[in-house]
Amino acid sequence: MTDQRTAWGWGLASVDAAGNTLDVWYPELKLGEAPKEVARPNHNFGNLAHEGVDVRGVRRIPVFTVSKLDEPIEDAADAYLRLHLLSMRLAKPNTLNLDGIFAALNNVVWTNYGPFAVEDFALRKLDVMAAANQSAPGLPKADVNVLSIDKFPRMVDYVVPTGVRIGDADRVRLGAHLSEGTTVMHAGFVNFNAGTLGVSMVEGRVSQGVGGGNGS
């Protein structure tokens, strides 16, 4: 019987007013058995974390996540950890159990101000614009621009792998695996649990579960 594969790390979760996890960002992840609570390293999120809600209606909470990689996904924090593993090149496509990922992830409004809950987006957008105007009345402010409404965010907002070129960041999802030497052209698209395994140029769609070899 093989040992259970495990990964762990501190993440910064965005949680809406209803208690739903909108996203989790993991700056660093480790493979192997997680340390016991008394031996855990401290997170370094500082004042990025806040228990009170911001103008988006979102709290940002540090979460320590341990993922059993051969078992189905337990929750959103677990799902985000596995997506980060793929984009950080700590796991290759089709090597992680991703059962339950769609049920674990919430549909989110992804914007230039970060993630919003879908249900009260219009009202929260007004709150954000009003707060921006109060901070510097009379000056033009960036509108709340919706980038997508989806369960999966852009990879580059969470992980920026070395040695790659990406023509259009909107077309590479978190959970894409891009090896060193990969170029994703403007028309290319790379889904989660998909990508490249060597020096490659992506000019079309790389669907979930597909990996291109060196020189493809």
Residue ranges and their predicted role:
Residues M1-D157:
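Terminal amphipathic alpha-helical/low-complexity segments used for targeting or macromolecular assembly
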Residues V159-S216:
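Structural signal for interior beta-strand "rungs" in well-ordered beta-sheet cores
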